[in-house]
Every structure is written in C-alpha cells, then in structure tokens.
Amino acid sequence: KCTGFALPGFQNAHSHAFQYAMAGLAELHPTAMKKNDFWSWRESMYALALKVQPEHIEAIAAMLYKEMLRHGYTHVAEFHYIHRDLNGSSYENKAELSERIARAAQSVGINLTIIPIYYEQGGFGLPPQKEQRRFLSSSFEDYLELNAAVKTMATKYENCEVGFGIHSMRGVALENIIELAKHRTGNTPFHIHIAEQTKEIEDCIAFTGIRPT
C-alpha cells in the first residue's frame, strides 16, 4: 500500500559508465594555470580509456549503476565505445567489454540498453588519433559484426536490449551513418552525439555545407 506520492523509475538515456572513475580528475582550480575546458577533459578521458582493463570496466559500471538505483534510476542506456584491448586489437570475444557492462547491470538489478558505438575516424575526413585506438571499428562490416556479437551476448541476460550507435557525425563517415540507419528495424534504439562543441558544428558546416541535424 502506498501512503504517499510515488514516482516511476527514471531512465538515464545516455551513460558512459567508465567515466565514473574520472570523478575529480578533470576539474582544475583556476590557480592551476592549465587548460580547463572540453579539450583538457577529453585528454583526461583518453588517459583513463587507455588504462582500464575489462575487470575495471565491470567494477566501475557496477558502482555507478548502484548509485543510479539508489537515486531512482531503473533503466540505463549505455553509450559504450571502448571495444578493443589496450593495444587497439580486437578481443577474441568481440563483445567482451559490452558483456562486462551487461554483467554489472544484472548484478545490481538495473535494466540495460547497451549501445555499442561505431567510431572510425578522428574528425570530418580525418584519420583516427592513436588515443582513440580502443574505440575503433576497422570498417562498416566490422561494426556490424560487433553489434551482432553484442546482440548474441545480450540474450544471456535479463532486461538487456541492444541498439545501434554512432559516436558522432565527425566520428563516422557520412555515407556509413546513412547506411547504418538503413539497418535499423522496428523500435531498435539509434543513438548519436549530434555535436559536443561549437567547433564540431563549425567543422560540420565546413565539411558538409550544413549544420548537424
């Protein structure tokens, strides 16, 4: 019996679980005399992404998801883009790191939409940076294989669904964004960063002639 107000569980529609371990690492006091902006934050994020092992990703995600549940979130969409090992090589199990996320979610009891992210370039028409090596799909077909592996993995877990994801318009060739959209069926989630910074909008206009929409 409910004797007061009741609210439905919230949904976190955009999570990067491994970044929970960055708390306090990317903020600088003005007296530090160092950059303190999105780009310095990204350097900190890359540094972390190039250190975390599968067991770390699972433990960090479990800690984060426990906190989400404690604060009323019952479903999380995980925008998951670390897929490869520290050297940028594929794991024997392509879904290795996605499965670590799924195991963390099931262990704490939160519903999960896992979105393996397609990432292939370092900017509009630019090659990927070495710091991005754990994120990359080597081709469109390579990403489809990754997504298929994650879908197969997800069948082992309760309350786990899978979507398609593009990191950003700068992170994937435009023709591949369009092609991936054709693979979406029914209510399959499709997730993308439209733009993270003003510079990204400016670069998009310079490269395509239009804003990211």
Q: Which residue stretches match the model-derived regions?
A:
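Conserved, mostly hydrophobic/aromatic
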Residues: 3, 14, 72, 79, ...
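Short capping/connector residues at structural and topological boundaries
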Residues: 11-12, 50-51, 165
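Alpha-helix initiation and N-capping motif
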Residues: 15, 19, 35-41, 210-213
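Short, solvent-exposed beta-strand-terminating loops
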Residues: 15-30, 113-123
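Metal-coordinating catalytic core of metallo-dependent amide/deamination hydrolases
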Residues: 84-213
